[in-house]
Amino acid sequence: MSLKHYPRIQLAQEIAKALRGESSISDAPNGLFLAAPRRTGKSTFLQRDLKPELERLGVVVVYVDLWADKKRDPALLIAQAIGQVLGEHLGHVAKLANKAGLKEIKVAGVLTVDTSKIGQVDGLTLAQALAKLQEASGKPVALIIDEAQHALTSQDGEDAMTALKSARDQMNVSGINLMIVMSGSDRDKLMRLVNNNKAPFFGSNITTFKELGPDFIAHVAQLIEAEYKSFAPLDRAALMAAFKAFGHRPQFFIAAIGQSLSPLTAPEGVRFEDALLQAGKDKVASEEEQMASDYIGLPPAEQVVLWRLLEQGQKFRPYDAAALAFYEEKLGKKLTPAQAQNALDGLRGRNPSMVWKSLRGEYAVDDAAMHHWYGVAINDGAWPPRGALVSDVVAKKRPRK
């Protein structure tokens, strides 16, 4: 039984059609921006479904994950990904040129290729490199950038986004020669690529990536029933409920299936579907307990600044008058702008980082799942977490019943 990959062929075909301008109601030719929580199958889909489908249609695809190496500048990762694919195509042209005894050849009557420098993109802008790739291959190009919001953390990264927008405008004058797909695991961060007139792709829309649903559950159920016939028929609705409990995250769901089927770890006297549902609830509870533990372990200043960030979201301003008043109320003492900045720096410096910062000084929680955790705690009247240093101050200010 293999649950490693569930192909989403129809979705890949629909997106490819939209990117190629074959859908009259889609703005995808101007750029497709997909947002989905971590671990919900977005990256797998881009690499194993969308990329092959575009290639099947005769499109040259460049894929780059900006989280592949967070220590390297995002712009460098993008340039190297383009350069690698460009080198592959120019290498083919070079072989043809060498066989003909030529030092230089022209591709499509326009592009001059120096065969002694094949694969090198030094001195080329991103727009020029993409144009050369399209001309050398004779095919349209699709650039897929995973975790694209990370580009906004450096000047070169932000400049690269602006350059890609320019490349799109230049290359698509006479048809769709450059398709751009950008994805992110945090909608709020990805939104910063499009949400104001200073954003590189201002005016574009963020699309929520479709979660795996009943079709995926039916696929999983059929595989299990084929190998474990005593389990048939499985309750699809119960399996779907369990998958939802895992936050629609296939990796954790499938791992729990393996544990529930193993004679070494399967719970006794519990229906398979119920065991999965409980495993999903336990997984989320464990993650939330870890978030609470991490929060409780912070110094008071970092606790209160993170609280403000969770409460305000994109409206967060670290040291405006309202923020400083908030800090004083929750801490029981004043926090200066410099102290608030030190708290933010401390949150960013933790491993893993708890706060993300863009080049323009915009802040967000690093793990978007914290927003859900915070919202649930607020609704349950369980905020701040018991044991947090700021909770003592808040408790003292609450009126006694």
Please identify what each model-predicted range represents.
Residues A68-K71, H150, S185-L190, L212-P214, ...:
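Conserved nucleotide-binding/hydrolysis micro-motifs of P-loop NTPases
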Residues H150-N196, F209:
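Sensor-1/coupling segment of RecA-like P-loop NTPase cores
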Residues S24-S26, L133-S137, D169-I176, A199-F202:
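Conserved catalytic network of the ASCE P-loop NTPase/AAA+ motor domain
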Residues H219-Q290, P300-A301:
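Amphipathic alpha-helical "lid/sensor" segments that cap RecA-like P-loop NTPase cores
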Residues A28-L152, G157, L178, L335-P337:
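P-loop NTPase nucleotide-binding core
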Residues A285-K401:
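C-terminal leucine-rich, beta-strand-based interaction scaffolds used for sensing/assembly
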Residues I9-S26:
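Pre-Walker A adenine-sensing motif
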Residues T44, M179-A226:
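Alpha-helical sensor/transducer elements of the RecA-like P-loop NTPase core
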